[in-house]
Amino acid sequence: MSYLGVGVSPGNVPVYHGSNLKVIDKRVRLAELVLRCLICGLGVLAAVLVGTDTQVKEIFSIQKKARFTDMKALVFLVIANGIAAAYSLLQGVRCVVGMVRGSALFSKPLAWAIFSGDQMMAYLTVAAVAAAAQSAVFAKLGQPELQWMKICNMYGKFCNQVGEGIASALLVSVSMVVLSCISAFSLFRLYGANKGKDCTRW
């Protein structure tokens, strides 16, 4: 079997488009590319803001330095956003290559791989933001019952920069969730294309 002279393996599905579907497909691809670029940029920004954040405070003639490594949740946040940025960069390159080639065929295994990867990145970034946000609340408000003091009263600059990093990471996680929905749409429309093709045969 062939489509426009191109061999089609069982794992590949020719996607037939009407004029309206072509416009939708183009918009979906563009939205995916924009989101991946946004995630890459914000992920790097979040990792840099948190990873380079330090502040030295002198307490009773003793200098104490606050680093992001003092809180494991912030270490997790830096690693997660670094991974998300690298992943989005690779997927962004794939999107650009696909848009330039304008391929009519789409591989189901590739679609599943992209969908699974986006899902994992979404869970990873959301978990990292949740953990970092909880730690930030403790640092800001303290926990009197456990005699945990308000760290941000002493390390104001450090906390402000961490807050900016968490805000960037939050945008990354939200964008990743939206992107996982787009990849789900791109995957399951292939099965819809197969169903529509079978109906036309009858």
From Swiss-Prot:
<dbReference type="InterPro" id="IPR006459">
    <property type="entry name" value="CASP/CASPL"/>
</dbReference>
<feature type="topological domain" description="Cytoplasmic">
    <location>
        <begin position="94"/>
        <end position="109"/>
    </location>
</feature>
<keyword id="KW-0472">Membrane</keyword>
<keyword id="KW-1003">Cell membrane</keyword>
<comment type="subunit">
    <text>Homodimer and heterodimers.</text>
</comment>
<keyword id="KW-1133">Transmembrane helix</keyword>
<comment type="similarity">
    <text>Belongs to the Casparian strip membrane proteins (CASP) family.</text>
</comment>
<feature type="transmembrane region" description="Helical">
    <location>
        <begin position="73"/>
        <end position="93"/>
    </location>
</feature>
<dbReference type="GO" id="GO:0005886">
    <property type="term" value="C:plasma membrane"/>
</dbReference>
<feature type="transmembrane region" description="Helical">
    <location>
        <begin position="30"/>
        <end position="50"/>
    </location>
</feature>
<keyword id="KW-0812">Transmembrane</keyword>
<feature type="topological domain" description="Cytoplasmic">
    <location>
        <begin position="186"/>
        <end position="202"/>
    </location>
</feature>
<feature type="topological domain" description="Extracellular">
    <location>
        <begin position="131"/>
        <end position="164"/>
    </location>
</feature>
<feature type="transmembrane region" description="Helical">
    <location>
        <begin position="165"/>
        <end position="185"/>
    </location>
</feature>
<feature type="topological domain" description="Cytoplasmic">
    <location>
        <begin position="1"/>
        <end position="29"/>
    </location>
</feature>
<protein>
    <recommendedName>
        <fullName>CASP-like protein 2B1</fullName>
    </recommendedName>
</protein>
<dbReference type="InterPro" id="IPR006702">
    <property type="entry name" value="CASP_dom"/>
</dbReference>
<feature type="topological domain" description="Extracellular">
    <location>
        <begin position="51"/>
        <end position="72"/>
    </location>
</feature>
<dbReference type="Pfam" id="PF04535">
    <property type="entry name" value="CASP_dom"/>
</dbReference>
<feature type="transmembrane region" description="Helical">
    <location>
        <begin position="110"/>
        <end position="130"/>
    </location>
</feature>
